[in-house]
Amino acid sequence: MAAEVYFGDLELFEPFDHPEESIPKPVHTRFKDDDGDEEDENGVGDAELRERLRQCEETIEQLRAENQELKRKLNILTRPSGILVNDTKLDGPILQILFMNNAISKQYHQEIEEFVSNLVKRFEEQQKNDVEKTSFNLLPQPSSIVLEEDHKVEESCAIKNNKEAFSVVGSVLYFTNFCLDKLGQPLLNENPQLSEGWEIPKYHQVFSHIVSLEGQEIQVKAKRPKPHCFNCGSEEHQMKDCPMPRNAARISEKRKEYMDACGEANNQNFQQRYHAEEVEERFGRFKPGVISEELQDALGVTDKSLPPFIYRMRQLGYPPGWLKEAELENSGLALYDGKDGTDGETEVGEIQQNKSVTYDLSKLVNYPGFNISTPRGIPDEWRIFGSIPMQACQQKDVFANYLTSNFQAPGVKSGNKRSSSHSSPGSPKKQKNESNSAGSPADMELDSDMEVPHGSQSSESFQFQPPLPPDTPPLPRGTPPPVFTPPLPKGTPPLTPSDSPQTRTASGAVDEDALTLEELEEQQRRIWAALEQAESVNSDSDVPVDTPLTGNSVASSPCPNELDLPVPEGKTSEKQTLDEPEVPEIFTKKSEAGHASSPDSEVTSLCQKEKAELAPVNTEGALLDNGSVVPNCDISNGGSQKLFPADTSPSTATKIHSPIPDMSKFATGITPFEFENMAESTGMYLRIRSLLKNSPRNQQKNKKASE
């Protein structure tokens, strides 16, 4: 491949280089056709001359186009100007390759460049190995490839097609260390991303501000100031780390300036909170069912016609979005606080019922022409819009009745619950209400396993069930009661004749969970004093024969709920006969002996005394139709074994209702607390007990008690 291509002197092309303005216009020779005889004699007509003239003009235009194409190729082949090299043999251009618009040149362009670069590397390696090798200095000679146009193209093709078929798309000058591309590399499928070596350039941003038009000024927002110390003004540390003494006036002034600057930089939205009330005020002018003048203009309707969406609503129904706004949803949470009331209690299945949605009928929207009658003077054009006439089921009052009947309000539901509780004789709710009306003080102390007979009573008197396996060994005779005694039930009357208000307050309506350690200790001392006084008063009394106590039984709690009702002799004898096979022998001996000085007799006497006091007001004791009495006293048999009626079973009895669920429902997955570190915990409580006395909660209690 030759180093240069020689086309001759440039002056040869100058006669063809005329500017467009200086191009002479063809002047047509006008021939006068006055005499037809002269035309025939000369043998040359006007038609032939005009045809020759047209051909000459086409030839001139074609030569000018070829001249411009040759000039462009000559500019491509000329040596680049402005490049100065020290050694033209090594530093000058190695070769120049012209890439034509051919599929082969586009496909193998990268391989051609790699071949040239490999040649340069091979030459450099040879120079390193043999420096003294003679180099060939050839004279410049014309290129072996002649840039000629393909003359096989038909002459009928236009000049424009020839240009497109033989246009140069790339011209690369290869030097030793670099290459110079004058026209650009060819693109693969005209896509620079698919062509190797092509990268989309990334330009640096020169203008950081908006360029304004002539005569206009653009207000540029102030930049947010950098945080700095409000005390000394340094940006290296914050105010909390400032070593300088604090200047309150300067700090306040700088903080205010910083906040103002931040507010201006953020368009007065710096550290502003989002409130729902602002949204309501913002869209407060929009009301459902009310069409404003702007909306009428936007819809293209007047106040003398119904909006088109009204006719569509007749087919789709009431908008579900506004129906959602009218929902009143109950949380379904039930509060078990142990208090006797119907406000925070729920029955079985009541939570699922409360989850049903209710609606506030006052929030139903009025839509004239949909759920209320169309105003007078406004026509109903439902046929034009392809809709349906007003439906009676979509009227507001009919829709409200539908919501009321299918989605009951909370008040109606609670009323139904009360009526159902009163109508069912064996429901737990009815039993609870009866116990509340009777004012039973020990209703909360009943065991959850204790049951009462159902409405269907049997003619037989109650019988004791066989004793359960003992949890703890029975206490021997003469053993004093244990140190820990349960607190008195809620509402238990005082056990001593003393009428002091302190005693009534301690044993009154104070919840045992809210008592402090000192109050519990004081209550324990009062219980012991009451037991000692009962022992001294009833030291000469004998225990009745039919007292339901075993020889080593200990009362777990006082039994104020048992009715002291007279029992016929026949019933008594029958009861004794039924009790003999099942009651242990020690029970008969102990009941006949009647030891008055033992703790069993003391507790029995105390239970009898309280029975006599509470008999007029207690209706909880289950008096059967045949006159037998079902005791409500929680009595232990053999230490911790309860005695229950014989005919008590799940099929014939209902469990006594308690507002607090059974502990077994809360004990799943709970690890029992082992009292290993109780000494440290108790000591810590005793240390901070003085601080707890002055707590706001205790101060409120003392204030209420004093009032």
From Swiss-Prot:
Its family? Belongs to the ZCCHC8 family.
Known post-translational modifications?
Phosphorylation at Thr-492 by GSK3 is triggered in cells entering mitosis; this phosphorylation is greatly enhanced by nocodazole treatment, but reduced by lithium.
Bias class Pro residues marks the residues at 466-496
Task: List the biased-composition ranges (Low complexity).
Answer: 456-465
The record's annotation in InterPro entries points to: NEXT_complex_subunit_ZCCHC8, PSP_pro-rich, Znf_CCHC
Q: What high-level taxonomic lineage is stated for the organism?
A: Eukaryota, Metazoa, Chordata, Craniata, Vertebrata
Query: What name appears for this protein in its UniProt entry?
Result: Zinc finger CCHC domain-containing protein 8
Give the N-acetylalanine positions (modified residues). Answer: 2
| Cross-link Glycyl lysine isopeptide (Lys-Gly) (interchain with G-Cter in SUMO2): where in chain | 413
Region annotation (RBM7 binding) ranges: 286-299, 309-324
Task: Indicate, by first and last residue, each region the UniProt record lists as having compositional bias (Acidic residues).
Answer: 34-43
* Zinc finger residue ranges, CCHC-type: 227-244
Looking at the record, which segments are called Disordered?
16-44, 409-518, 531-607, 641-660
Effect in UniProt of substituting residue 492 to A: Impaired phosphorylation by GSK3
GO BP, sorted A to Z: co-transcriptional lncRNA 3' end processing, cleavage and polyadenylation pathway; mRNA 3'-end processing; mRNA splicing, via spliceosome; RNA processing; snRNA catabolic process
Q: Which residues carry this modification: Phosphoserine?
A: 598, 649, 658, 695
Just give the chief location class: nucleus
**Compartments in which it is found:** Nucleus, Nucleoplasm; Nucleus
Region (MTREX binding) residue ranges read 659-707
State the disease linkage annotated in the record. Pulmonary fibrosis, and/or bone marrow failure syndrome, telomere-related, 5: A disease associated with shortened telomeres. Pulmonary fibrosis is the most common manifestation. Other manifestations include aplastic anemia due to bone marrow failure, hepatic fibrosis, and increased cancer risk, particularly myelodysplastic syndrome and acute myeloid leukemia. Phenotype, age at onset, and severity are determined by telomere length. PFBMFT5 inheritance is autosomal dominant.
Q: Which GO terms describe its molecular function?
A: RNA binding; zinc ion binding
